[in-house]
A protein has these predicted regions:
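Helix-rich C-terminal "cap"/substrate-channel and partner-interaction subdomain
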Residues: 321, 339-342, 359-364, 375, ...
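Active-site substrate-recognition segment that forms the wall
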Residues: 120-128, 219, 231-271, 275-372, ...
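Glycine-rich Rossmann-fold phosphate-binding loop(s) that bind the pyrophosphate
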Residues: 39-45, 65
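Internal hydrophobic alpha-helix adjacent to the cofactor/substrate pocket in enzyme cavities
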Residues: 52, 387-409
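Helical element adjacent to the flavin cofactor pocket in flavoenzyme catalytic cores
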Residues: 143, 150-155, 177-235
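Glycine-rich FAD pyrophosphate-binding loop
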Residues: 52-75
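Extreme N-terminal leader/targeting segments of oxidoreductases
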Residues: 1-35, 53-59, 458-462
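Dinucleotide-binding Rossmann-like beta1-alpha1 core, especially the glycine-rich loop
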Residues: 83-167
Length: 463
């Protein structure tokens, strides 16, 4: 525990590059392009990549306030998982169940598409497709797992995608405490997100795209992005700003920036790894409501995250001091040791935080207004590593007017209502988190589903 205070306050993923993270020049005065993309994370880079792959003649400009990978794309848990936040049922309500399941299957396939691009572009980001394992550590969690498997079978999803694990099988994957059962989800991989986002940026440049960093976009209107450093004129403008959407004029209530924190251990020995499992490097968590997440890195560290406190700052503020809050990282460490007590004496070398973005309807999506030429993609609720690829591919098809199967998926055209003004946003987050935390505590203590607490949390989430 003492090592936590001495850990580097920096993302593990961005701490090993020999080159400068700030290697690209800012915008230098007005410029005209075909497509301007605001945001140098996964969403913006994948959009640019597929645009240029399909039409190399396009003039594509990415505008990044800091450097590529500064935001969630360089700070996340490295879960490249073929799943979307929000749930199939919500997408079915705005289309049909068949279409919602088509979106689900397309997400399953997206992990392999990402691997294809990484291989073809020679991007070494420690990609390893070891699946995802969620262990149930109390009876309500186990019951939810069984219900999830039953529902998957009813909808035609087979064991090659998702299957139940008994207690022994689950412990063989993740040797956690109090394991009742588990779920194995095959279309999931681990990545080093920093290597992935930096490699993707270079791939975009090789294809002819231009990236300006240290460039602050202030506002978007038809055909124009106003930046501190100059005005960008463009036929199409794509907003890919995720947790930093509040920085764009008039967009403060579009997405809620919520904090997540991570820690990374020192590299483990072979004997330590044998004690905790994770032999095939699956991503892992348990079935609690306040999400935790982890992976074993290619150099045998455990990178582990969770929400901590506070999850949200009044007025949608983003504060780097909060990202490195020691108390929040202590909560993450306690969750890790509660799950895997074998690691209680292992040193923590890095601790960091970042923001994820939540739309009011909790549904990720994308849209392109043909009249104004302005598009948006994101709102991934913390599950954007793989989803951003599908969103970027789809946005490219919309811009190029390609009649692909992607442009009719039911997350295309999703538009959430805006978040409530303060203090309602702040109160809503605090109440929702308190009820979910109470549900986790109650279920562990009583071994019964916390129905009332979760009903209130679902109402606040708009479920």
């Amino acid at each position: 525990m003492s090592s936590l205070q001495n850990a580097r306050e920096a993302p593990l993923w961005l701490d090993s590059f020999d080159e400068s993270l700030h290697g690209r020049k800012p915008l230098d005065g007005p410029v005209s392009v075909d497509v301007a993309i605001i945001g140098g994370g996964y969403s913006g880079l994948w959009t640019a990549y597929y645009l240029l792959e399909n039409d190399p003649s396009l003039r594509v400009l990415i505008i990044e306030k800091e450097f590529c990978g500064y935001g969630a794309s360089g700070r996340n848990g490295g879960w490249c998982e073929g799943a979307l936040a929000g749930g199939t049922e919500k997408y079915a309500k705005r289309s049909t169940m068949d279409e919602a399941l088509r979106l689900e299957r397309t997400m399953f396939e997206t992990v392999d598409e990402i691997q294809r691009v990484l291989d073809s572009e020679d991007i070494n980001c420690d990609f390893h497709k070891g699946g995802f394992v969620s262990v149930a550590r109390n009876l309500p969690q186990a019951q939810r797992q069984r219900s999830a498997i039953e529902l998957a079978r009813e909808r035609g999803t087979g064991e090659e995608i998702i299957r139940i694990l008994d207690a022994d099988e689950a412990r063989a994957h993740v040797n956690a405490t109090n394991v009742h059962s588990g779920i194995f989800f095959a279309p999931s991989a681990v990545v080093d997100p920093g290597k992935m986002v930096r490699g993707l940026a270079k791939a975009v440049e090789r294809k002819g795209g231009t990236i300006v960093e240290g460039t602050t976009a202030l506002s978007i209107s038809t055909g124009k992005v106003v930046c501190v450093e100059g005005v960008v004129s463009a036929d199409v403008i794509v907003q890919a700003t995720e947790g930093y959407t509040r920085d764009i004029k008039g967009k403060k209530l579009d997405l809620l920036p919520v904090y997540s924190r991570m820690i990374a251990t020192e590299p483990l020995t072979d004997s330590q790894i044998s004690e905790i499992g994770l032999a095939n490097r699956p991503t892992f968590n348990d079935g609690r409501y306040i999400v935790i997440y982890g992976q074993r890195t290619s150099d045998n560290r455990i990178a582990f995250g969770g929400q901590g406190n506070p999850p949200y700052l009044y007025g949608s503020r983003i504060d780097s001091a909060v990202e490195s809050n020691l108390h929040s990282h202590k909560v993450v460490w306690e969750n890790l040791v509660n799950l895997l007590p074998q690691l209680k004496d292992v040193a923590i070398t890095h601790r960091w935080g970042g923001t994820l973005a939540i739309p009011r309807n909790w549904l990720p999506g994308l849209r392109l207004d043909k009249r104004s030429g302005v598009g948006f993609l994101g709102g991934y609720v913390g599950e954007g590593v793989a989803a951003a690829n599908l969103a970027g591919r789809t946005m490219a098809d919309l811009i190029l007017e390609r009649q692909s199967d992607l442009i009719s998926l039911p997350w295309v055209g999703v538009r959430s209502r805006k978040w409530e003004p303060e203090p309602l946003r702040w109160l809503g987050v605090r109440v929702s988190r308190r009820f979910m935390g109470a549900a986790d505590t109650s279920e562990t203590k009583k071994q019964k589903t916390a129905k009332l607490a979760m009903r209130v949390a679902h109402i606040l989430r708009g479920d």
